[in-house]
Amino acid sequence: MQPNDITFFQRFQDDILAGRKTITIRDESESHFKTGDVLRVGRFEDDGYFCTIEVTATSTVTLDTLTEKHAEQENMTLTELIKVIADIYPGQTQFYVIEFKCL
């Protein structure tokens, strides 16, 4: 069985598959992805594979520079996005945006 390259919380699976979630915001430990990378995607909870994505762009962002566009690409409000990122990465402020499309 081939390992997954990146995982997402299961609650995001439907939005990813439907194309409503087109970015992910990660910390430095996942800053190595590059435009053009093709990644196997699994669920964080059980590592079960559910799709393959292609990285279409990467950039950096801080909590203070998150925008409504980031929130739209995450399929949530800006307030929700800031809370989710702060909950997942407490105490961190520098992040890496990975834009992607499902293949």
Swiss-Prot record:
Q: InterPro entries, alphabetically? A: AC4CH, ASCH_domain, PUA-like_sf
Which positions fall inside the ASCH domain? 6-101
Describe its function.
Catalyzes the hydrolysis of N(4)-acetylcytidine (ac4C).
GO molecular function terms attached to this record: hydrolase activity, acting on carbon-nitrogen (but not peptide) bonds, in linear amidines; N4-acetylcytidine amidohydrolase activity
Keywords from the UniProt entry: Hydrolase
Q: What is its EC number?
A: 3.5.1.135
Catalytic activity, reaction form: N(4)-acetylcytidine + H2O = cytidine + acetate + H(+); N(4)-acetyl-2'-deoxycytidine + H2O = 2'-deoxycytidine + acetate + H(+); N(4)-acetylcytosine + H2O = cytosine + acetate + H(+)
Name under which the protein is recorded: N(4)-acetylcytidine amidohydrolase
GO CC: one term?
A: cytosol
| Taxonomic lineage of the native organism | Bacteria, Pseudomonadati, Pseudomonadota, Gammaproteobacteria, Enterobacterales
Name the protein family. Belongs to the N(4)-acetylcytidine amidohydrolase family.
Q: Which organism is it from?
A: Escherichia coli O139:H28 (strain E24377A / ETEC)
Organism superkingdom: Bacteria
Pfam families xref list: ASCH
HAMAP family according to UniProt:
ac4C_amidohydr
Gene3D superfamilies registered for this protein in UniProt: Hypothetical protein (2.30.130.30)
Q: Which PANTHER family match?
A: UCP029143 FAMILY PROTEIN (PTHR38088:SF2)
Q: What positions does UniProt annotate as the active site of this protein?
A: 21 (proton acceptor), 24 (nucleophile), 74 (proton donor)
